[in-house]
Regions:
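Short, solvent-exposed loop/turn segments at conserved positions within beta-propeller repeat blades
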Residues: 135-138, 187-190, 240-241, 294-299
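Surface-exposed loop/turn elements that mediate protein-protein interactions on large endomembrane-trafficking
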Residues: 1-8, 28-43, 61-77, 92-116, ...
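Repeated scaffold domains used in trafficking and secretory/extracellular systems
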Residues: 6-19, 41-54, 75-87, 91-92, ...
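Conserved beta-propeller blade signature
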Residues: 23, 56, 89, 131-132, ...
Length: 359
């Protein structure tokens, strides 16, 4: 497998890795490119998300646009936010200026009718008919609610236990909700834990941890460091990737199905890198940013790892040392590498979108 650089597009703000649509700024003007058609905009879109046959376009001002192809179907003037990609609803919110508390709701984008009877001070995750509300820092809990916002159950993050090694006295919180599998709600936490709750009762079903602070806690199944966790729909697995290796967890049983250490499995491939950043699951592969201790002036290298073959497929220094030194341009961990069909997409710190084509 090999990729060659096809093009570079400067001043890109938002882009959709599923089909390559993007927004950009040039000479003080803003543009949105959908299906190869350039649309002039009053402000530049910050986020593009392909959901089914529609493109969701979101602006920093809170404005939202719904497109089919390059045709505008619906526009909402403000106070919107994108929800998780498992839903086609659009999030809405209002800020209480007296308390600086944000209240959330959601609606179908066509009719804008709120689903919840009242907006609530909880972030929302919606999948099918399940509504999950959570507050990491005030209420410090997760709950399932109905359309009337009544709690069907609640789970306090205090019950996850403290980390008495790295962050004593602090309460754990959600980093990512991975999804619902066989009536299990899976999420990863700030303290390096992976938790599954019964979506009907809110009771803990599985708890895994790679945190040394949990080694003596009988309620946790010990695994190697979890790193970044992703749900893989194809085989109902959770893939956890760190700089040391990866682990595959059966999301239906909570069992560790696979475990791999990069230095042992692929020492001359991915194992030769000193640092692995921004792993991004893409089916049976994951992409990453890489760095050696001898590298200078930031990150310039990316790679693709085959989870089944357990080996590095491709790597490239897409921003060479000379360019990084001369321009201070480099890659950033907040912008991972995406695979879409036969193309690769990644943005650098100067908002240039690099597009690669597979040979």
């Amino acid at each position: 497998m090999n990729y060659i650089k096809q093009t570079r597009i400067e001043n890109v703000v938002g882009f959709c890795p599923h089909n390559g649509d993007y927004s950009y700024e040039r000479k003080g003007r803003s543009y949105l490119v959908l299906d190869g058609v350039i649309l002039g905009k009053e402000e530049v879109p910050c986020a593009l998300s392909l959901r089914g046959t529609h493109m969701y376009v979101w602006y920093a001002s809170g404005r939202f646009e719904l497109y089919r192809g390059h045709v505008l179907v619906k526009e909402i003037g403000g106070n919107t936010n994108l929800l998780n990609e498992q839903t086609q609803y659009i999030g809405t919110h209002l800020l209480d200026l007296a308390t600086f508390q944000t209240y959330y709701n959601y609606a179908f984008p066509i009719d804008e009718h709120p689903v919840l009877s009242d907006s609530i001070p909880y972030m929302l995750y919606v999948e099918d008919d399940v509504i999950i509300a959570y507050d990491n820092f005030r209420k410090k809990e997760i709950r399932r609610i109905d359309n009337r916002t009544e709690a069907l159950w609640s789970f306090s993050f205090v019950d996850l236990g403290e980390d008495n090694i790295y962050t004593p006295g602090e309460v754990d919180h959600i980093v990512k909700i991975l999804g619902i599998v066989n009536d299990l709600l899976w999420f990863s936490t700030q303290f390096g834990r992976l938790v599954a709750l019964d979506v009907a009762t809110g009771k803990v079903v599985y708890q895994l941890s790679g945190n040394p602070a949990d080694q003596d806690k009988v309620e946790y199944t010990q695994v190697a460091g979890l790193g970044d966790c992703f749900f893989r729909e194809a085989d109902k697995s959770i893939i956890c990737i760190s700089y040391l290796g990866f682990q595959v967890i059966d999301a239906t049983t909570g069992d560790l199905a696979e475990s791999s250490v990069f230095l042992e499995e692929d020492p001359d491939g991915i194992g030769r890198f000193d640092y692995i950043y921004a792993p991004n699951l893409q089916g049976d592969y994951f992409t990453f940013l890489a760095e050696m201790k001898t590298d200078w002036y930031g990150i310039g290298r990316v790679g693709i790892f085959d989870l089944k073959a357990r080996k590095l497929l491709w790597t490239e220094e897409i921003i060479p040392f000379e360019e990084r030194k001369a321009t201070r341009n480099h890659l950033v961990t907040s912008q991972p590498l995406y695979i879409s069909g036969d193309k690769l997409y990644i943005k650098d710190v100067k908002d240039t979108l690099h597009i690669f084509q597979r040979e």
